[in-house]
């Protein structure tokens, strides 16, 4: 059979499948073992919290609950990369980022238990509340970023969207707003 194409994809790898270093030029954050351990502890906490919340939901003790299973590392990384005065416009399952930024587990449970006071969380007051409708948080982040640009503030607005959100009008509108800035 004839070959239509061959190609190689370059990638950057620091650990092999056994967790052993394959490079010596680690980024600065990865050389801080204490910080890495703290981030890992938070990832583990998020995994355990998520499991407990799912159990509460499955037994009728908690309302709708959006699991974050498998997203722990990505969400903790988002929280750890942000500065305190940056703005986070979460979707509805970025607990790792929110815990890193000061939101309390009790507040998450309050919200998903039907008590809107859970949205009055302990994290930065300028972070947005959870958005359950798909992709609506994208416009919030784009608007905050535009305000930072107009005011010449060295801040960022961060949001997260899933695969389904990229087909929504709010996602596309936010991309247009961001591109026009």
PLM feature segments, named:
Residues 31-34, 44, 69, 100:
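Residue-level detector of secondary-structure boundary/capping sites
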Residues 48-51, 55-181:
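Cofactor-binding active-site loop characterized by glycine-rich and histidine/acidic residues
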Residues 1-28:
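Charged, compositionally biased N-terminal leader segments and the immediate start
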């Amino acid at each position: 059979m004839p070959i239509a194409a061959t190609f190689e994809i370059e990638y950057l790898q620091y650990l092999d499948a056994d967790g052993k270093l394959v490079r010596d030029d680690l980024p600065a954050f990865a050389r801080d073992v204490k910080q890495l351990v703290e981030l890992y502890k938070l990832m583990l906490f998020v995994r355990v919290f998520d499991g407990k919340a799912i159990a509460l939901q499955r037994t009728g003790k908690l309302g709708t609950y959006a699991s974050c299973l498998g997203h722990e590392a990505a969400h903790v990384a988002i929280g750890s990369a942000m500065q305190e005065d940056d703005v986070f416009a979460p979707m509805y399952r970025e607990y790792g980022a929110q815990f890193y930024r000061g939101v309390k587990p009790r507040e998450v449970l309050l919200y998903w238990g039907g008590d809107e006071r859970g949205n009055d969380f302990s994290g930065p007051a300028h972070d947005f509340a959870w958005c359950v409708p798909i992709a609506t948080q994208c416009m919030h982040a784009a608007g905050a970023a535009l305000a930072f640009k107009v005011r010449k503030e060295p801040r960022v607005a961060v949001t997260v969207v899933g695969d389904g959100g990229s087909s929504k009008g709010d996602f596309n509108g936010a991309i247009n707003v961001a591109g026009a800035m």
